[in-house]
Design a protein with these regions (language model features):
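OB-fold and OB-like single-stranded nucleic-acid-recognition modules
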Residues: 21-180
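Bacterial N-terminal signal peptides
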Residues: 7-16
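Positively charged n-region of N-terminal signal peptides that target proteins for export
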Residues: 1-4
């Protein structure tokens, strides 16, 4: 934990952060822009039944990368200071692999939230008790709104690197900064 916080603090204090390298899209939920909702996501994780679904827009730090997955990259994102304040993000590698994914990376992601604290069909429970998936451009907009993953300022989830929107994106580290 100290390593993650010191990494975040170092990034905050660094005047040469190169994060605005690509534009991040708005996170859309039911046709409206959804702000980062880490607190709401953690409330859903702790207070809803298995398979509860909603729209999530998270901002945090990669704290673990799950190995042994084939067509998807699975990784844990720390959303707050509590030991279980995490979510598993599941990214479809058919939109290219996230080549800059590493523990300590700063992540913003938008996608479909699902409480996953028990096996459902052939899907095991998430080790984090909740997942964020469909974090890429939607191939079926009637079923899913598009999502994305930004890792250390690089946008992922768009085919062939096509930008989603064209505007400046600036990370907000305020919610991750330790209390002074």
């Amino acid at each position: 934990m100290k390593r993650i916080l010191s990494t975040v603090v170092g990034l905050i204090l660094s005047g040469s952060i190169a994060f605005a390298t690509e534009a991040a899209p708005d996170c859309i939920a039911n046709g409206q822009v959804l702000p980062v909702n880490n607190e709401q996501v953690l409330q859903w994780k702790n207070n809803t039944k298995n398979q509860y679904k909603n729209r999530g827009h998270i901002y945090g730090v990669v704290s673990k990368i799950y190995q042994g997955k084939k067509s998807h990259q699975h990784f844990q994102v720390k959303l707050a200071d509590g030991p279980r304040d995490t979510i598993e993000v599941i990214y479809n590698t058919s939109f290219n692999e996230i080549d800059n994914l590493k523990v300590g990376a700063v992540v913003e992601s938008c996608g479909d939230y699902i409480t996953s604290n028990a096996r459902t069909g052939h899907y095991p429970a998430s080790p984090d008790g909740a997942i964020l998936h469909w974090v890429h451009e939607s191939t079926n907009s009637a079923r899913h709104e598009s999502g994305y993953v930004v890792v250390d300022g690089v946008l992922h989830g768009m085919p062939h690197g096509r930008p989603f929107y064209d505007y400046e994106w600036e990370p907000n580290f305020d919610s991750l900064a330790p209390a002074m």
